[in-house]
């Protein structure tokens, strides 16, 4: 079975490793920069922009690709799935119209409003920076300020966190030539719920919590994600059964709404939720696996990913097709020392021994047997254990054995940070 994976990050390395557990998979890759982990296991790699739809389509046809899995959001927005599907290649990933759930935040909020879907925060769309600035100045509370398009997870500024009111105004004024969305600031604990979706049915994956801030203690600028964790029971103590059921219901209602709009959703749906005093609210939807969250869930996937992909493509997915090991995971990203502001490329890094972990390469170069940093997140270790403490211990030990001009967040997955999350939610709801 010839499978094409589009994308070359840590998420895509995880997708490729999960697929190739099936000996019948013949893996092909298209990626903008060569990922040495993917290149090692692929039959052939096409080093080319994944958003160049005609070129990717030609590569797929040349190699008689049967199925494709699209990792990042940019090729979804470019219409890669539409082109591959038209050519008879089954895809794990939504068509462009359905991917708007991520690529156009205004569309997402409008869809939730139109169909009365729960969990939508109060929001306002502004067509000019001036309009946004005026609203920010007049609004009595705190707001999240974001462009409606793709920002790589780094486009939001939240009043009371990264900026004050004047800082929010200044940021809004920089967002020229795009629609700006202003949303009420949500207070609570974030969690990620990803699901496999076949157009009608969803099958959830373990809950994951990501850590966007660059530095320990959840401070510093937002990043693409410095690491994440999941628990052995696949839930969180700060997400009640009612909260969880509501989050599932919100995602199912969103899938139903997209089908009603004439754009059935097939692929991975990622719900980023803020669990507030009154229950989960949707921060955003993504139209693909999270990065790093994909590495947590795919590291403990026990069912065959190729079979899941076939059921997604054929519209025959059921809960019986998906199973995960009852293990905890902790993912810690190794990044260039000055990431995300001024990361330096070309620094040599060495990797030491690691136990009970999986290493996923991301934005990294391998030249003459030497690993070197590039300008984004370098690589990630996922520790796997019977408990969060055990998984964190393995991930931490592996990261400590990496040397070079790099850093990581040692607090991700620790008992102290986890206890802080639980206490915060308890205080919020007391």
UniProtKB/Swiss-Prot annotation:
ATP binds at residues 136-192. GO terms for biological process: 'de novo' IMP biosynthetic process; purine nucleobase biosynthetic process. It catalyses: 5-phospho-beta-D-ribosylamine + glycine + ATP = N(1)-(5-phospho-beta-D-ribosyl)glycinamide + ADP + phosphate + H(+). Mn(2+) 1 binds at residues 272, 284. GO terms for molecular function: ATP binding; metal ion binding; phosphoribosylamine-glycine ligase activity. PROSITE patterns: ATP_GRASP, GARS. Pfam families: GARS_A, GARS_C, GARS_N. The keyword Oxidoreductase does not apply. Residues 109-314 form the ATP-grasp domain. Binds 2 magnesium or manganese ions per subunit. Its EC number is 6.3.4.13. Mn(2+) 2 binds at residues 284, 286. Pathway: Purine metabolism; IMP biosynthesis via de novo pathway; N(1)-(5-phospho-D-ribosyl)glycinamide from 5-phospho-alpha-D-ribose 1-diphosphate: step 2/2. Keywords: ATP-binding, Ligase, Magnesium, Manganese, Metal-binding, Nucleotide-binding, Purine biosynthesis. The keyword Metal-binding applies. Belongs to the GARS family. This is Phosphoribosylamine--glycine ligase. It comes from Methanocorpusculum labreanum (strain ATCC 43576 / DSM 4855 / Z).
